Amino acid sequence: MSMFCFQCQETAGCKGCTVRGVCGKTEDVAKIQDLLIFVTKGLATVANEGRKVGIVDKKVNRMIIDNLFITITNANFDFKAIEKRVKDTLVAREELKERVQAKGGNPIGSDFKGCATWTATTSEEMMEKASQVGVLATENEDIRSLRELIMYGLKGLAAYMEHAMNLGHDKEEVHAFMAETLVKILDDSLSADELTALALETGKFGVDGMALLDEANTSTYGHPEITKVNIGVRNNPGILISGHDLKDLEMLLEQTEGTGVDVYTHGEMLPGHYYPKFKKYAHFAGNYGNAWWLQNKEFASFNGPILMTTNCITPVQDSYRGRIFTTGAVGYEGCIHITADENGYKDFSQIIELAKTCKAPTEIETGEIVGGFAHNQVLALADQVVDAVKSGAIRRFFVMAGCDGRAKSRDYYREFAEKLPKDTVILTAGCAKYKYNKLPLGDINGIPRVLDAGQCNDSYSLVVIALKLAEVFGTDSVNELPISYNIAWYEQKAVIVLLSLLHLGVKNIHLGPTLPAFLSPNVAKVLVENFGIGGITNVEDDMKMFLGE
């Protein structure tokens, strides 16, 4: 069986990639990722049985999290690294089995699809199995759709859990749920209704995961605050850090202090500037470039080393191949991968030494952008915001969180932001902001018309803000507030955000630029009928719809 992947918005023809991923992953990489998911379900099976006899292994929890994160779109293209993880997972599974058996447990449980017992000794055996366990192994279209909706939610949740765990914050209940759910989506006895309920329950734990990460980030680095971020360059050599992991950012800033090397953020690392703890670093120079999909040009013109801490990495170009490093879940064949020691410390000295030999970044723009409007900062402005709503100065909020991407159709979001009436405010998080965060959209009574809460996980902040506004205005539901949801999605973190919003009862969310290919017509119908999920059409008609005109 050839590869099949339809987990991201850009999947071929909005149906699925079957020869090579639009993201750039090869058939072999797609298949080894499928196999990694399969053996991770096997490890989860044994972990579930372990919990029944009192065995909770934090290393196993971490392995499950890391395995899921690695398979997120644009995270890891390194076949050998993923194959090694498959082998390591099989070893961990067998070791855990022995411990469960010694405690009197049944280590393989129901062993759905043989995931707790299958093994291999050669690469050929692995690839043969990989061809049998992909998405299309589930023949029923609706069951497949629901299973993948849940699976992609778990992948997004895994990303948020990994970042929280890197900062020493954890929640066993989330790990237990994830392991149980990985096994349930192999269970052919579960009906579509039961899987739909499981998808919403995944959203509940998505909220827990985002809350945990918010606590981890803010307790470690302080609450984000209103910040102006330089988008120009200095004359020193620099290191560009991309992705989402704030712990990696902290270690890089510590190690570059006093070296004469500046640090710039890229993409989803931009919100690092909003945290008080990072403002003490004079060499934290600014943000370089835009969203992930423009990295081919921007990494070339940056001139210095690039550190990818998480997705999104795209196929590496010759113009910067010798300057790009990966860490964490990221991998790309031929790039140096930096691992942490047993204490979580990463030595970035080789990146720093390389930076010293490089030219300063080439300037591609100048000026400043403003962000830092996470829940704590916005609630500090609550009186000002409430007064503006009551006076009519603010007519409506538009949640335009989510992702950016290559598709020309995403220009819709820039045009939508430009044409919004001057009495509206955009609430955003994630890299979708790059479509409009540099536009001169002005302010309302001193409140910027684009309030950037931060990274995609900071969509949690937008939920907290909405719930607080509902409380202030005395409404029974966030759906009664003057808030519309026009969200751009791309990958699996957007899926867990969506499921979290649905769990919280948010209705009438519009997704674009296309609805997910993994939603079968029947599953899409359920989401439309029960939650008011919709797509987008064109700016003029959609704006009339949102504004009730």
From Swiss-Prot:
Annotated catalysed reactions: A + NH4(+) + H2O = hydroxylamine + AH2 + H(+)
GO BP terms, alphabetized: response to hydrogen peroxide
Binding annotation for [4Fe-4S] cluster: 5, 8, 17, 23
EC numbers: 1.7.99.1
InterPro entries (alphabetical): HCP/CODH, Hydroxylam_reduct, Prismane-like_a/b-sand, Prismane-like_sf, Prismane_a-bundle
Cofactor field: [4Fe-4S] cluster; hybrid [4Fe-2O-2S] cluster
Family annotation (Gene3D superfamilies): 1.20.1270.20, 3.40.50.2030
GO molecular function per UniProt: 4 iron, 4 sulfur cluster binding; hydroxylamine reductase activity; metal ion binding; peroxidase activity
Main subcellular localisation: cytoplasm
Enzyme class name: oxidoreductase
Keywords: 4Fe-4S, Cytoplasm, Iron, Iron-sulfur, Metal-binding, Oxidoreductase
Superkingdom of source: Bacteria
Entry's localization field: Cytoplasm
GO cellular component: cytoplasm
The record's free-text note on cofactor binding: Binds 1 [4Fe-4S] cluster. Binds 1 hybrid [4Fe-2O-2S] cluster.
Modification sites for Cysteine persulfide: 403
Residues that bind hybrid [4Fe-2O-2S] cluster: 244, 268, 312, 403, 431, 456, 491, 493
Keyword Iron-sulfur: yes
Keyword Cytoplasm (UniProt): yes
Functional description taken from the UniProt entry: Catalyzes the reduction of hydroxylamine to form NH(3) and H(2)O.
UniProt family annotation: Belongs to the HCP family.
Protein name stated in the entry: Hydroxylamine reductase
Taxonomic source organism: Clostridium perfringens (strain 13 / Type A)
Gene (UniProt): hcp
